[in-house]
Amino acid sequence: MSGMHGASREALAAARERLDALTDSTSVDAGSLADELAAVTALLHREVSLRRVLTDPAQSARPRPSSPSVSSAPRSAAPVDLVAGTVRSRWSQSRDLVDALEQLANIADLTAAQKRGRLDNVEDELFRFGRIISSNTELRAALTSRSATTAAKSELLAGLLGSRAERTTERLVTRLVTAPRGRSLESGLESLSKLAADRRDRMVAVVTSAVPLSDTQKQRLGAALAKVYGRPMHLNLDVDPEVLGGIRVQVGDEVINGSIADRLEDAGRRLAS
């Protein structure tokens, strides 16, 4: 989804603005909206020919075909209007429309968590789940197996997350696992984490240290990184005794080793004084 260009990027930005306006209304249940958007996403992912017709620029000069399946997927007016506006936009390729609808569904779920004051928990849980997956090959194999049924994967996730994680976390991960749409589990979790951070207009730093950081160290490192990057910074923390230099910080594609991190902290203190 991050690879959208040109018309698709503009269409996605407009769709996200419409979604934000919709979820700002107290009468709209963001969680239910997420379910309905996810249903449309699944439908258009299956119906490739329909998706291509809906995104064909040649159709823009005349009414687009109406599909009973698409029109009946959302059950209330709000998602119908949102989906209709998104479909009417110009998309560079048909897959971009499905990617956009999926992203809208995920954002709606994250918005629901934000309204409940639970977004920080969801961010942390997505990161921790990613770390569990990377260290447990058997679990990863079970969740990505093509021979396992959707029901079996959902049941496994319910057992893992149901009583331990936020409901939003379970919903997001379950959708990703049961409908990966060609993505790896790791890249899907990373995309979800970025969306969660984006809800607060902040960046994510993955901090791996040889020993757990103290609260003071976390606060100082977060403040220093925020000053350097010019945006609030959410720290995803991991401990690995084999980390060279004692600490490793990754912000996007940029990796910062321990010595540079120390200089960042010093710079942050000087700016604050």
UniProtKB/Swiss-Prot annotation:
List UniProt keywords, sorted A-Z: ATP synthesis, Cell membrane, CF(1), Hydrogen ion transport, Ion transport, Membrane, Transport
Cellular component per GO, a single term: plasma membrane
Annotated stretches, region: Disordered? 55-78
Q: How does it sit in the membrane?
A: Peripheral membrane protein
Q: Does the UniProt entry include the keyword rRNA processing? A: no
Give residue spans, biased composition: Low complexity.
57-78
**Location of this chain's protein in the cell:** Cell membrane
Q: Which InterPro entries match?
A: ATP_synth_OSCP/delta_N_sf, ATPase_OSCP/d_CS, ATPase_OSCP/dsu
Q: Which residues belong to the signal peptide in this entry? A: none
An example of a GO molecular function for this protein is:
proton-transporting ATP synthase activity, rotational mechanism
Listed under subunit, the entry gives: F-type ATPases have 2 components, F(1) - the catalytic core - and F(0) - the membrane proton channel. F(1) has five subunits: alpha(3), beta(3), gamma(1), delta(1), epsilon(1). F(0) has three main subunits: a(1), b(2) and c(10-14). The alpha and beta chains form an alternating ring which encloses part of the gamma chain. F(1) is attached to F(0) by a central stalk formed by the gamma and epsilon chains, while a peripheral stalk is formed by the delta and b chains.
What family does this chain come from, according to its entry? Answer: Belongs to the ATPase delta chain family.
Summary of the function given for this chain in its UniProt record: F(1)F(0) ATP synthase produces ATP from ADP in the presence of a proton or sodium gradient. F-type ATPases consist of two structural domains, F(1) containing the extramembraneous catalytic core and F(0) containing the membrane proton channel, linked together by a central stalk and a peripheral stalk. During catalysis, ATP synthesis in the catalytic domain of F(1) is coupled via a rotary mechanism of the central stalk subunits to proton translocation. This protein is part of the stalk that links CF(0) to CF(1). It either transmits conformational changes from CF(0) to CF(1) or is implicated in proton conduction.
This protein's name: ATP synthase subunit delta
Instruction: State which gene encodes it.
Output: atpH
